């Protein structure tokens, strides 16, 4: 029988390292709550990034997935994870940098991603996975609360930006719940939150999404500027294109809907 999450970490002398962006969760009930929010079903193929001391890993395994693949770059955690594997042979441990992983490398059916992501790479991973959304069943992720609010933000709000636009064009997004700093060791300086993203059945092709990325980068770089000024270097006839879409030249980036950006991308 495995010891508690905290005792298991202590037995391996694993302490959080800042260079890995580590904030460990020792509360098994919180880990269970995250897995419940994911709606994980038995016999699913699951991916977890940064399992660390294995708290969330254990909760996922209790749902009896077909296969749980964990990606861990901290070699100190590998022996601990191997001890969990002794009780759960459906655990696949890969020592690798998550930023070098392609979902297609896993050679599995639709992947359910459940992770407490390192905050310094969280946004980048979300965007990468959205671009491979045909391989994803859903993503239930712990991120900084501020990032989750940006993912879920609606037009004409302060948090609305590039991330909001791209996420809403590719997936349905749902904020599940907040997590206080005290839930972690060591406590981070900010609140966290759980968000679930489920890819849409019909999504724009990759070329259009790339154009949306370019347009939103330009638009939100001049967030307080009128959209015709922000996008003046996008196309010489930008005012005509905006008029064609019934978008006022006097709008700002935050006033355009995700579909407005998609329509504009289709004209570029």
Curated annotation (Swiss-Prot):
Q: Enumerate the NCBIfam families for this protein.
A: ksgA
What InterPro entries is this protein classified in?
Answer: KsgA/Erm, rRNA_Ade_diMease-like_C, rRNA_Ade_Mease_Trfase_CS, rRNA_Ade_methylase_Trfase_N, rRNA_adenine_dimethylase, SAM-dependent_MTases_sf
**Gene Ontology CC entries for this record:** cytoplasm
Q: Where does S-adenosyl-L-methionine bind?
A: 23, 25, 50, 72, 97, 116
Please state where this protein is localized. Answer: Cytoplasm
Gene3D superfamilies tied to this protein:
Ribosomal RNA adenine dimethylase-like, domain 2 (1.10.8.100), Vaccinia Virus protein VP39 (3.40.50.150)
Q: What is its EC number?
A: 2.1.1.182
Q: Which reaction does it catalyse?
A: adenosine(1518)/adenosine(1519) in 16S rRNA + 4 S-adenosyl-L-methionine = N(6)-dimethyladenosine(1518)/N(6)-dimethyladenosine(1519) in 16S rRNA + 4 S-adenosyl-L-homocysteine + 4 H(+)
Question: Has keyword Iron?
Answer: no
Gene name of the encoded protein: rsmA
Q: Which UniProt keyword terms apply here?
A: Cytoplasm, Methyltransferase, RNA-binding, rRNA processing, S-adenosyl-L-methionine, Transferase
What does UniProt list as this organism's lineage? Bacteria, Pseudomonadati, Pseudomonadota, Alphaproteobacteria, Rickettsiales
The family annotation for this protein states: Belongs to the class I-like SAM-binding methyltransferase superfamily. rRNA adenine N(6)-methyltransferase family. RsmA subfamily.
> What name does this protein carry?
Ribosomal RNA small subunit methyltransferase A
Which Gene Ontology molecular function entries are recorded, alphabetically?
16S rRNA (adenine(1518)-N(6)/adenine(1519)-N(6))-dimethyltransferase activity; RNA binding
Tell me which species this is from: Rickettsia bellii (strain OSU 85-389)
